[in-house]
Amino acid sequence: MSSYLQESTRKAVTVTSLQGMRAAGERIAMLTAYDASFAALMERSGVDVVLVGDSLGNVVQGQKTTLPVTLDHIVYHTECVARGTTKALLMSDLPFGTYGTPEQAFHSAVRVMQAGAQMVKLEGGEWLAPTLRFLVERSIPVCAHIGLTPQSVHAFGGFKVQGRGDEAAAQLKADALAVQDAGAQMVLMEAIPATLAGEVTRLLAVPTIGIGAGPECSGQVLVMHDMLGVFPGHRPKFVRNFMDGLTTIDAAVTAYVTAVKDGTFPGPEHSFTA
């Protein structure tokens, strides 16, 4: 049995303990979940952070993007996931159009926190710093999502790797420092070159979570449906199907946690170059 599965003696994961994991060099394993049953399974398997992502628009609702996801959708799924978790930290996305001003972000975050979230995730860099600071000053833990931000898919002209080239890399570093200075307790980086993600991770004092950002981040996240190989859409380069060769979902999630913790995932084949 994996050493990460000591559920009876496992302490609840908190924002503070995530910082401690980073300091100790223990990688953080995060997965998305959208209901109580899968959330409980992930907790049994040693997942540190469960994310109610707006990816539910793609994998649950069948949408082409995350843009149609509403705050009511996130609140509902957060309530469901909260019923299945007691030890993993529960993070929820604020969906598109719900944090245009600091005040709107606060009211959106309050609803999600009241539904059971312990941290909220917002997409944006330097421009988002005043909003992040506004939330943190009001005791709402925040994770900033930089790099490829799916809510900006149309502004990017599609799902494209970010941070390539000197100017883009410098901007991403500036984004990371700005959101940290604003009080973000975690930074998620998506679809950026692995070397750049490593540089940002060493630059920051808070944990970094990667998805398509190489192996040097403080932790990793995948969408549950992707890592189980059940999503019929395009499989991104950074995804590994952990169901391959296994017969149960529990075993696949445990394999994911183990691979993240021991540093065997992601490999070079899951990472982007500059």
Swiss-Prot record:
Chief location bin: cytoplasm
CDD domains xref list: KPHMT-like (cd06557)
Cofactor note: Binds 1 Mg(2+) ion per subunit.
Keyword set includes Magnesium: yes
Disulfide bonds: none
EC number assigned by the record: 2.1.2.11
Record: residues binding 3-methyl-2-oxobutanoate: D54, S55, D93, K121
Keywords from the UniProt entry: Cytoplasm, Magnesium, Metal-binding, Pantothenate biosynthesis, Transferase
Taxonomic superkingdom: Bacteria
Residues holding Mg(2+): D54, D93, E123
Catalytic activity: 3-methyl-2-oxobutanoate + (6R)-5,10-methylene-5,6,7,8-tetrahydrofolate + H2O = 2-dehydropantoate + (6S)-5,6,7,8-tetrahydrofolate
One GO CC annotation: cytoplasm
Family per record: Belongs to the PanB family.
Family annotation (NCBIfam families): panB, PRK00311.1
Assembly description: Homodecamer; pentamer of dimers.
Record protein name field: 3-methyl-2-oxobutanoate hydroxymethyltransferase
The organism of origin for this protein: Ralstonia nicotianae (strain ATCC BAA-1114 / GMI1000) (Ralstonia solanacearum)
Lineage: Bacteria, Pseudomonadati, Pseudomonadota, Betaproteobacteria, Burkholderiales
Gene this protein is translated from: panB
